[in-house]
Amino acid sequence: MPRFDIVGQLGSLRRYARSLTRDSADAEDLVHDALVRAYERRGTFRSGGNLRAWLLSIVHNAFIDKMRSRRSEAARVEQAGYLTDASTPAPQEHSVRLAQVREAFFSLPEEQRSALHLVAIEGLSYQEAADASGVPLGTLMSRIGRARAALRGMESAAPAPAKNHLRIVGDPS
């Protein structure tokens, strides 16, 4: 039985779970459930296999199972309402831009958000991400393409930065 470096994978698992659930508490629950499943199914892990990809696929499958068990679409819509931050972001332009990117990312459909997260944030190859998601490679690639196109569309639809219409009055010397 191989030894697992689960602790070294927790950051990736938490980020991916947060990306899927859009809620920190739900993400922690999802990671916990996935780790319990991984422990129970540790015999199915192939020696020499990619532990991170295996664990991420368990997180993904646990998320899908959780979504299937929810009673109605209304419960998911209500859950998404908790995304808004109660705190006001810092006024710096970078902070505002980061909040806009985060909002755009979380507005993507779950399948696109999941695919983009695995490749762009977790750094998995397309094949590893497809395996973790349980979809064919072509499906994953088109989901990523649609996600990127949607984000580009949101970028072009964003209002242009405000121009300074103030006039300097007085002697410039």
Residue locations for each model-derived region?
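Acidic, proline/glycine-rich intrinsically disordered inter-domain spacer in sigma factors
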Residues: 4, 74-106
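A short pre-motif secondary-structure segment
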Residues: 115-119
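Σ70-family region 2.3-2.4 aromatic/basic alpha-helix that recognizes the −10 promoter
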Residues: 35-39, 49-69, 144, 148
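Short, aromatic/basic-enriched loop-to-helix "N-cap" motif that marks the start
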Residues: 11, 43-57, 137
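A short, charge-rich alpha-helical start-of-domain segment used by transcription regulators
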Residues: 1-15, 25-28, 39
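Short, small-hydrophobic-rich alpha-helical interface motif
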Residues: 13, 27-38, 58, 129, ...
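Arg/Lys-rich amphipathic alpha helix in sigma70-family domain 2
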Residues: 46, 57-78, 93-94, 153
